Amino acid sequence: MGKMGKRFAAAKAAVEGKENITVEEAVALLKGNSKTKFDETIEIAMKLGVDPRHADQMVRGTVNLPNGTGKTVRVAVFARGPKAEEATAAGADIVGAEDLMETVQGGTIEFDRCIATPDMMPIVGRLGKVLGPRNLMPNPKIGTVTMDVKEAVEAAKGGQVQFKAEKAGVVHAGVGKASFTEAQLVENVRAFVDAVSKAKPSGSKGTYMQKINLTSTMGPGVSLSVENATGN
């Protein structure tokens, strides 16, 4: 068994039998198991009682993690004139209009978040088949179609996380790095869970939050107590 295999086996043994534990216990376990040479991402996955194929059961939104994500987020902005200048001044990595559309159509997508002013949507709309599957399509419901370009760019750069339920009703996201303190990770996890809780759709039937798992990039997952994670 190689080093990585032994490391994973040891990490798995450490979490064996530990289910429905508190956020604090889970974070301590994951940090203790993180022995890789790179800074692992701590990821959360939540199984929700929704069928996102129905419009009244779609779950999506954003949350500003209090301690950021630890990741460098590359932001693209579709804008012209003063708004393009505002985006650049706010720290956007790529700013453009038709030229940016052509770049994306050509298959070059060197950004993690996409923002657009409302007047740019006829252009951005042509990129739906490219941006949509990557969850990069600007949307007014999550604040990425806006005239307040400065605020949107700063939020994206400052640790704002977007979430959206997938077909199986699962929401997942990175909530920090293994190098974060336990307190920082706990705070981020609780902020994310709270945001998903508040995004409960009108069509959700039965138990909304069914399972919550926390894992690191190279480690096994641990099951959280839903009651503890939600503060109920």
UniProtKB/Swiss-Prot annotation:
InterPro entries in UniProt: Ribosom_uL1_bac-type, Ribosomal_uL1, Ribosomal_uL1-like, Ribosomal_uL1/biogenesis, Ribosomal_uL1_3-a/b-sand, Ribosomal_uL1_CS
Keyword terms: Repressor, Ribonucleoprotein, Ribosomal protein, RNA-binding, rRNA-binding, Translation regulation, tRNA-binding
Q: Name one GO cellular component term.
A: cytosolic large ribosomal subunit
Among the Pfam families in the record, one is Ribosomal_L1
The family database entries (PROSITE patterns) matched by this protein are listed as: RIBOSOMAL_L1 (PS01199)
- Membrane-spanning regions, if any? none
**Top-level taxon in the UniProt lineage:** Bacteria
Q: Which GO terms describe its molecular function?
A: rRNA binding; structural constituent of ribosome; tRNA binding
Which BP terms in the Gene Ontology apply to this protein?
A: regulation of translation; translation
**Family recorded in the similarity comment:** Belongs to the universal ribosomal protein uL1 family.
Quaternary arrangement and interactors, per the entry?
Answer: Part of the 50S ribosomal subunit.
What role does it play?
Binds directly to 23S rRNA. The L1 stalk is quite mobile in the ribosome, and is involved in E site tRNA release. Protein L1 is also a translational repressor protein, it controls the translation of the L11 operon by binding to its mRNA.
- Name by which UniProt lists this protein: Large ribosomal subunit protein uL1
The opening ranks of the lineage are:
Bacteria, Pseudomonadati, Pseudomonadota, Alphaproteobacteria, Rhodobacterales
Q: Write the gene name.
A: rplA
